[in-house]
Structure formats: C-alpha cells, structure tokens
C-alpha cells in the first residue's frame, strides 16, 4: 500500500511575503519542518526550472509551489542533512540551504543584547565565518546578525546572491531586535549590505554597523573578514597588565596614518614609522581615528564603521601587524575614539532601521549644530552597549593600549554649542547630560576591569570636576585628561613678542595652580596646526633663528612641566606649513641645520625624560618653584623631583628664558650645595643654537637666593632652556 505525502500547508499570503523576502520569520516556512506524516522542505529558487532535494538516502523532486518557492515532502520521522540541486536551463548547481540552520546566537546572547550588557557584542553581531559538518560533508559559510528592532524585514545582499536579498531574508530573534541568518559558501572577502524594510514599508540598503572590514572608500559595502594574525607581543601584554601607566614615562607622538608619509599602508608603516618613533624616543604613538570613515577630510572623526579599521591602509590583520611591531619595540599604541557623534551618511548608522535608532530621537539632543552630525542616544542601553563593546573590541582584538576619547565636553553638556531655546534641561533642571555621564563611567570602568594596564584619555576642554577621578567616587573614570588650559595659555604667551611677554607672565605660570588637580597630558596636537592656525613654529615671533629657538624653548618647557606630553607629527622637525592631510610632511626640512637641530632636541628630550624619574613623577611633591615671579626677565625656574627604582631621590633644576636676550651671571637658587652639571641646553650648537652654554662643572656657592641656602651663577641663553642636575646624579 502506498500513499502520497502532503507538505505542511502554509497560507498564500505568508508564502508571497517569504518569496519577496519581506517576512519576519522565513525560517518558520523555509527549510525542513517535521510534520505528522513526514518532513516538508521548502526552498527559494526564483527562475529555476527544476529543484531536487538531496539527502543521504536519495534525491527527491520538489515542485514549484508559488512565486519562486519550491516544496518537497519527504518520508521519515526526523530531519536529516540535505542539499539543494537547482537547474536553470542546461545548468545545474548544488548548494546548501541557509534555512536548515539553527540560530547562531544563543538565548543568553539575545538576553544580554536586550539588556545592553553584551560586552563581547562584536563576537555575535556582524559577519562571522563558521564551519559545520554533517552526513553530507563540511559546509563553511558566514553567519550574519544585525540589530534593527523597528524593521519589518531584513535581507542580506552581496555578490554571493547577485545582490538579490529575496534569497537570503533574515529571521527576527524575537524582542531582542536582532535579525540573523547563516549563508553557506560565503567566506572572507565577500562584500555585503543589509536591505532593511522600515516601519513605513520602504526598503533601503545599509552597511553593517558591526562590520569588521569594509570596502575602500568611496565604496560603502561591508566585507566579511576573519582573524588570522598570530601575535608576538606576549611580553609586552604581560608587562602592561602589571604596570601602572602613571608611574612611568609617557611621551606621545600623534600621527595621521595617511599623511605621515603618503602612500604607506599599515605594513609599510610598520617598516618605516615604528623605527622612526623608536629612534626619536617616544614611548607611545597615538593614531588619529582609524575606524572607517568615508570622507578623508574628516581626518577620521566622522565614523561610519566603528568596528572596521580603515581599509585605505590595508586589512584588519595588517593593522594588527602594525600594533604588534610597535609592541615588539616597547612602544605603546593609543587610538583616537569618537563616541560623541556620527555622520548622517544614508548608508550607515543614520536612521538605521527607518527610525532614530543610534541617534537621540529628541531634535534638541540628537544633532550636533556645529558638525552637522547625529549625537548618540546615550540613554538607550543597546546603544551604550554598542559603544562600550566597541572600546573593548579595539583593546582586545587589536591590543590597543589606550583610547583617547574625542569631544568629551560635547557629551557632558546638553547646551554644548547650543543657544537658549535650542536645548532642554535634564530632569533636575541642569545642563548636564546624565545619560552621557553614565555611559562614560560605564565605558571607563568596563575597559579598566577587562584590560588592566590600559589608559583612557579624555579630550575635555572645560573645568568639569573629577574627569580623572574614579567612578567609585563619582568621577568620570578617565586615566588622563588633555590639559587644554596649559596649551592655550602657553601658545598665547609664546605668540607674544618677547618685549611684551613680561605683561603676560601669568599665562606662563597659571597652569601650575591646577597642574595636580587631574592627571594631565600636555597636548600640542593636530588641532593647533590646522584651520588657519599655522604650524607651531609659525606661531613664534621674530626671524627664522628666533622662531626655531622659540620652538626649542617651548618643547623643553613642555617636557619639564608636570604631566605627560603629546606632540603632533611634523612639529618635531619644525614643520613650517600648516598640516594638510592630503600631503606628506616636509621631510626635506631635515636637510636644513636648524630643523635637524629641533629633531635632535626632541630626541634628546625624550632620552633624558625616559631615564629621569624626576621628569615624569607627577605627584605634587615632585614639583617646586624656584622663581615664578621673574616676569621682568621672562624667566621661570623650578625643581622636578622623583625617585628611581632603587629609591634614590633625583632632582632636576629647570630654567627657561623666554626673552630674546641672554643672561650672563644669572643667579639661581639651588636645593643643596656641591657640584652641578648641565644636562640640557636648547641653545647648544648641536640643536642649531648659538652656543650660550655652561661648560664643565658648576659649583654651588654659599649665597642664599630664591629662598634657597645656596645658589649658582649661570649663563642662560636667549629663548632657551637650561637643565641642571647634581654631578653625582649623572650616570
């Protein structure tokens, strides 16, 4: 006795929705489903002439049911592995079926995503290559998952389906807002996007917010990638976990990867930039944002793919190679991170599922008036999760040693760059963005918990209290903060003609009033050499010699001032032109003696700094004024103090003359008697100076001065700095 098996019936309207790729649960219709009298298998095969289902026990012909959907009823009481044979005219292909696979996200994953607490978000969302094995062999493909809670339907499209998303519509994983599908035979290098049907029924294409690789701009597709790099920095990473970054030197070289030298990718930078930074003595390099951005003129500060290193310079593994190369040379890597805002490009995060999803829906909070960008909705837990996990991603997957967080002030204040009537107070009537504060605290606390030894740095331009105070005490939890006040005051002072500086002496000394209220970085960054501001050397008054001397005195002052220091690329060679991201630095300047001298000075400053705890000990006990009040001579002098690993106390006497004339026999009070030696003089001929130096041993005299028991008479060069140490301290 025989009888014909009947497929499990499905409503025609649902079949039509599935066929068009607009059904929220295609896996409930397509794929294999066990019924009372057998197994029903439905597949999508538009324009096919014939479809067969191949199982371990044989092949079964499918019949065309409706709108490109084919169905077969198989005998049996359990679902087995199968493949699909599809005939188009004279051609037949055999492929695996995306709709026979279970979700690649577990219930715990979707729960944590819904709660905004999935710290490893990049491991479950985005595109991930996976391999499965069954009775018919091995299948490798890519699992796609995207968060789009307000979408009516989502499809993944790419070269693998001829950009026809009706063959690969994704399933909704319930209230999590996640859509998911595993697509067999899609591997590394495949380009893809998501087609999203918004609440209004319109379709639009979006790049993957969690993409870990992208096409080279201006192309905008996401790219499937995987992780193949084998790290060689185990010694560095172990030491990082055990050290406190505050208890050591930190001299940062800020770099724009595309214009340090034009045409270099990540691997070429490993060959050229790494040895250069090593030679110059910087302890860290800080890259301007490398997350993918469509417009090069944004310098990376308008990010569209937060999880993808810019493909302009190579692959994600190429970037890992670069970081690895820095670590092998003992150099830390800091990355600029931009969680404050994102651009309105239609292919990216903006109105991602047809609604304000990543951006704040309130127009008085959701747009940045100065930059024409959207502001993240820090009050939405899934958005906070996206950003917190992003910070962890760079720290974990790329071994980044720190993140410099851009535009923190714009997050903290609801009225930032807004006039009256353009902002709405918080629940207490204040201008503080309480949700942003919570996000910042969460991001910092989580980063330090997951990755001991890293550093989170705030670019925060206001007097917000407790930026570097721990979150446990109500602080924002950053490890360091850019000292914008020091930078502004110092550059304003040095832009004055030396004749007039006596009237601006307070601008030079004011920073020491608050120097120990936070953990500071002293930044001479890219922001000071763009938008018509000129280069650092162009800010100095006088002729070429005076401008070079002024630049050298600035650097000596910066390196000896409490705080860590940061210098933007090109300024170490006295770059004369304002920075332009479209051109390489003017390396030919090193053929000129004066510019080569500036570079030699920066190299010497870093060498002295790294070997002298007195210069990087940022405790308030490590600084003492000798004379802060000699404004008539444009002179300041102070002590830096610290202890080496053996507990030996070190001192460095720092004298800076910002006047255009030298001082012969200038008396300076010293902390104790004995022999002293000059370890740095920015007017030395080797740095391009005029040679007003102190040769040989300097003997402290029993002449009280500056409130000190002894003193010495010195030669102090014009527009120059002198550093002295006890002769016994020279090693």
What is each PLM-predicted segment?
Residues 1-36, 64-148, 173-254, 261-264, ...:
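The feature marks proteins involved in alpha-glucan
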Residues 28-33, 37-49, 140-143, 150-152, ...:
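Carbohydrate-binding surface patches
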Residues 41-43, 48-59, 146, 151-166, ...:
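Beta-strand-rich binding/interaction modules
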Residues 43, 146, 194, 255, ...:
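Conserved, mostly hydrophobic/aromatic
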Residues 78-82, 188-191, 696-731:
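C-terminal beta-strand-rich structural cap/linker in extracellular carbohydrate-active enzymes
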Residues 111-126, 130-136, 213-254, 492-552, ...:
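Glycine-rich phosphate/pyrophosphate-binding loop
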Residues 211-221, 227-252, 256-432, 698, ...:
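Substrate-binding/active-site clefts of carbohydrate-active enzymes
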Residues 218, 399-401, 419-584, 589, ...:
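Conserved alpha/beta catalytic core and glycan-binding cleft of carbohydrate-active enzymes
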């Amino acid at each position: 006795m025989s009888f014909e098996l009947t497929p499990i019936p499905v409503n025609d309207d649902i079949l039509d929705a599935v066929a068009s790729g607009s059904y929220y649960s295609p896996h409930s219709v397509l794929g294999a489903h066990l019924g009372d009298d057998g197994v029903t298998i439905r597949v999508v095969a538009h324009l096919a002439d014939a479809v067969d289902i191949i199982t371990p026990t044989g092949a079964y012909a499918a019949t065309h049911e409706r709108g490109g959907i084919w169905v077969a009823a198989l005998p049996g009481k359990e679902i087995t592995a199968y493949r699909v044979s599809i005939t188009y005219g004279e051609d037949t292909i055999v492929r695996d079926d995306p709709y026979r696979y279970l979700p690649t996200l577990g219930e715990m994953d979707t729960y944590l995503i819904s709660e905004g607490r999935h710290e490893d978000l990049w491991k479950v969302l985005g595109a991930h290559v996976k391999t499965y094995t069954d009775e018919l062999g091995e299948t490798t493909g890519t699992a796609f998952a995207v968060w789009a809670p307000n979408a009516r339907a989502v499809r993944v499209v790419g070269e693998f389906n001829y950009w026809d998303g009706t063959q690969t519509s994704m399933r909704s994983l319930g209230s999590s807002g996640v859509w998911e599908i595993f697509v067999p035979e899609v591997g590394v290098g495949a380009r893809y996007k998501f087609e999203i049907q918004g609440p209004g029924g319109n379709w639009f294409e979006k790049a993957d917010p969690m993409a870990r690789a992208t096409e080279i701009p201006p192309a905008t597709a996401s790219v499937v990638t995987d992780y193949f790099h084998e790290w060689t920095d185990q010694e560095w990473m172990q030491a990082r976990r055990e050290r406190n970054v505050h208890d050591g030197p930190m001299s940062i070289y800020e770099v724009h990867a595309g214009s340090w030298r034009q045409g270099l990718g990540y691997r070429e930078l490993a060959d050229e930039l790494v040895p250069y930074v090593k030679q110059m003595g910087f302890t860290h390099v800080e890259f301007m944002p490398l997350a993918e951005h469509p417009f090069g003129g944004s310098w990376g500060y308008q990010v569209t793919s937060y999880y993808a290193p810019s493909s302009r310079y190579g692959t994600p593994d190429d970037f890992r190679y670069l970081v690895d190369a820095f670590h092998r040379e003992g150099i830390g890597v800091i990355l600029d991170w931009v969680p404050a805002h994102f651009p309105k490009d239609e292919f990216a995060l903006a109105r991602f599922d047809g609604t304000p999803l990543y951006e704040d829906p309130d127009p008085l909070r959701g747009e940045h008036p100065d930059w024409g960008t959207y502001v993240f909705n820090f009050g939405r837990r899934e958005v906070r999760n996206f950003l917190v996990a992003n910070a962890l991603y760079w720290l974990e997957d790329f071994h980044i040693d720190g993140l410099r967080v851009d535009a923190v002030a714009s997050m903290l204040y609801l009225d930032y760059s807004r006039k009256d009537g353009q902002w709405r107070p918080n629940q207490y009537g204040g201008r503080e963005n309480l949700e942003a504060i919570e996000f910042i605290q969460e991001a910092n606390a989580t980063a330090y918990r997951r990755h001991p030894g890293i550093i989170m740095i705030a670019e925060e331009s206001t007097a917000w209290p407790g930026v570097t105070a721990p979150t446990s005490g109500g602080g924002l939890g950053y490890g360091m903060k850019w000292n914008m006040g020091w930078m502004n005051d110092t550059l304003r002072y040095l832009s004055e003609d030396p004749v007039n500086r006596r009237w601006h002496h307070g601008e030079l000394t004011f920073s020491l009033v608050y120097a120990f209220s936070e953990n500071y970085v002293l930044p001479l960054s890219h922001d000071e050499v763009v938008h018509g501001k000129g280069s650092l050397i162009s800010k100095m008054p006088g002729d070429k010699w005076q401008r070079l001397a002024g630049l050298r005195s600035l650097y000596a002052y910066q390196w000896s001032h409490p705080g860590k220091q940061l210098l933007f690329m090109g300024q170490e060679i006295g770059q004369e032109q304002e920075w332009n991201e479209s051109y390489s630095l003017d390396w030919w300047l090193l053929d000129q003696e004066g510019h080569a001298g500036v570079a030699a000075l920066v190299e010497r400053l870093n060498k002295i700094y790294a070997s002298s705890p007195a210069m990087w000990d940022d405790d308030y006990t490590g600084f003492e004024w000798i004379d802060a009040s000699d404004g008539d001579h444009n002179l300041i002098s102070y002590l830096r103090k610290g202890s080496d690993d053996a507990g030996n106390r070190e001192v460095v006497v720092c004298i800076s003359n910002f006047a255009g004339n030298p001082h012969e026999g200038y008396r300076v009070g010293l902390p104790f008697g004995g022999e002293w030696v000059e370890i740095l003089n920015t007017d030395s001929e080797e740095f391009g100076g005029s040679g007003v130096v102190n040769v040989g041993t300097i003997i402290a005299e029993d002449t009280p001065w500056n409130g000190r028991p002894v003193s010495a008479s010195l030669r102090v060069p014009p527009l120059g700095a002198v550093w002295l140490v006890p002769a016994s301290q020279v090693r």
